[in-house]
Amino acid sequence: MTISVWTIILGTLCAGVGSVLIAALLARALMARFTQHLLSLAAGALLATAFLHLLPEAFESETQPHSLFLTLLLGLIFFFLLDKAELWHHGHEHGHDHDSSHDHDTGSSLTGSWAVLTGDSVHAFGDGVLVAAAFMTNFSLGVAASVAVLAHEIPHHMGDLAVLQRGLGQGRNALLKLCLAGGVTVVGGLAGFFLIEGHEAWLPFLLVIASSSYVYVALADLIPQLQKRLSAAETAMQVLWLLAGIAMVTVAVHWMHVH
């Protein structure tokens, strides 16, 4: 039990806070020109985790496939509604069009900053629960879920940091608050562990819910941002980074199985 708890804490900490710290480093070093590549990488990681790992694991259980497909459908609708409520999709446009999207006055910037932090916290809690469910199914699946969360949060946190720095002023203050919001992933992971323990029959459904969240974010959020008129070379780079995301998750899971 202790090992499982610490494994979940480490996995959710890397995914939640790690993504914020990496985003801060990349925002300073790479700026916005590599954001599109990160979006492609994240989309590939999310789709690979959902379709190649989480869903197959869920359907290997004795749960009725009809019930799992219904859960997948309801999950997609649920995340769509959260998106509309600006809790899940709270600011996924951040960082992709700063000049037009973030041209707010000082008051609205401050309000937007707290909206971003609230949305990040809700999002992080949900991620933590789903990562915990993956770890409790098997270790390699938990690693895949953590990598997917890490990958798709990095480009979003790069945008979030820009909004928070504008609304809260100092860069360190913005980074600290975003790290605290990302740390809610650990809280979600612990809550998930203690809720699921003794109720392992829920695991297939939680894996499907995790899949629906990953598929929704990839197809409704990330990939539409890549649908622009680009040259053949730029389009090829998008595809290569998408495949790199798929390969990254696949290699990570395979390595965990081998070791």
Where do the protein language model's features map onto the residues?
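Intrinsically disordered, metal-sensing/regulatory segments
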Residues: 1-259
